[in-house]
């Protein structure tokens, strides 16, 4: 049994299983939501090992539910007979009002739901979804140039402080 002081810090910690770094480069993320994941036992064990790929994954509403598609969770080696399909569609758990709000925004032209990271929060697998609009090639170049100029300014300021 956990004590009150020790349990809160451990519960508040989030263990990130995977992050989609490419999503922030390819998309302009405007809003984020947290959703639970419906997983099998072998999928949870694979996630805890970090055996997941979010690079081509996206979420979309189907009927009254939200689904995560193209998220590859690798097979768990010790689950020989009771494994899972690595690319199966996975149901996302959100409140009805949140699902309706997300559906309204996704149905607008040009928006998509992109998983930004999968993590464990108090032992439960969660996914952070971002409402995103795709960037054009020119926008990506502009973002790179802006990031480089910010780095140069920070370096110049750091050099100025040292003197």
Curated annotation (Swiss-Prot):
It comes from the Bacteria. CDD domains: SmpB. Residues 138-163 are annotated as: Disordered. PROSITE patterns: SSRP. GO terms for molecular function: RNA binding. Residues 138-157 have a biased composition (Basic and acidic residues). Keywords: Cytoplasm, RNA-binding. Pfam families: SmpB (PF01668). It is found in: Cytoplasm. GO terms for cellular component: cytosol. InterPro entries: SmpB, SsrA-bd_prot, SsrA-bd_prot_CS. GO terms for biological process: trans-translation. Disulfide bonds: none annotated. The keyword RNA-binding applies. Required for rescue of stalled ribosomes mediated by trans-translation. Binds to transfer-messenger RNA (tmRNA), required for stable association of tmRNA with ribosomes. tmRNA and SmpB together mimic tRNA shape, replacing the anticodon stem-loop with SmpB. tmRNA is encoded by the ssrA gene; the 2 termini fold to resemble tRNA(Ala) and it encodes a 'tag peptide', a short internal open reading frame. During trans-translation Ala-aminoacylated tmRNA acts like a tRNA, entering the A-site of stalled ribosomes, displacing the stalled mRNA. Belongs to the SmpB family. This is SsrA-binding protein. The gene is smpB.
